[in-house]
Amino acid sequence: MSKTYLPPQESLERDWYVVDATDKRLGRLASEIAMILRGKNKAHYTPHLDTGDFVIVVNAEKVAVTGKKRTQKLYRRHSGRPGGMKTETFAKLQQRLPERIVEHAVKGMLPKNSLGKQLFTKLKVYAGPTHPHDAQKPKELNINTIPGAES
């Protein structure tokens, strides 16, 4: 009978990464971020434990989408009251709350349970180029979202 490997919690080293979202494709960027938050890039990945790293996303206001998604992609939210459905296009939400676009995309790629909520707290998204996490000494992470392009 095989036994699931459990890495000791003391040995888990959580790194901090900073990702620049300028001109990056939203979905491809979000899937890479979700993989790092989950810890799938590490040798001691365990599905039911939080083994991932922290990710800081800067320049969320400059994230890119392809095709007509800028005008046709809709984000919906509901207040819980009758007739309380609010609909907003990608372009309007990007003007109003650019962080929410990246957060929404990454959250959809994480587990839909308590572990997913815990992983989501390790994502920090900022609209502009600055962030308040310099004390953590984050490493620059370059994510190539354009297939075949060198970066």
From Swiss-Prot:
Pfam families, A to Z: Ribosomal_L13 (PF00572)
Assembly mode: Part of the 50S ribosomal subunit.
Keyword Transport among record annotations: no
Domain of life: Bacteria
GO cellular component assignments: cytosolic large ribosomal subunit
Gene Ontology biological process terms, A to Z: negative regulation of translation; translation
Record-level Gene Ontology MF annotations: mRNA binding; structural constituent of ribosome
Region of interest: Disordered: 129-151
Functional description taken from the UniProt entry: This protein is one of the early assembly proteins of the 50S ribosomal subunit, although it is not seen to bind rRNA by itself. It is important during the early stages of 50S assembly.
Feature: compositional bias, Basic and acidic residues: 131-140
Gene that produces this protein: rplM
UniProt family annotation: Belongs to the universal ribosomal protein uL13 family.
Protein name per its UniProtKB record: Large ribosomal subunit protein uL13
Keywords: Ribonucleoprotein, Ribosomal protein
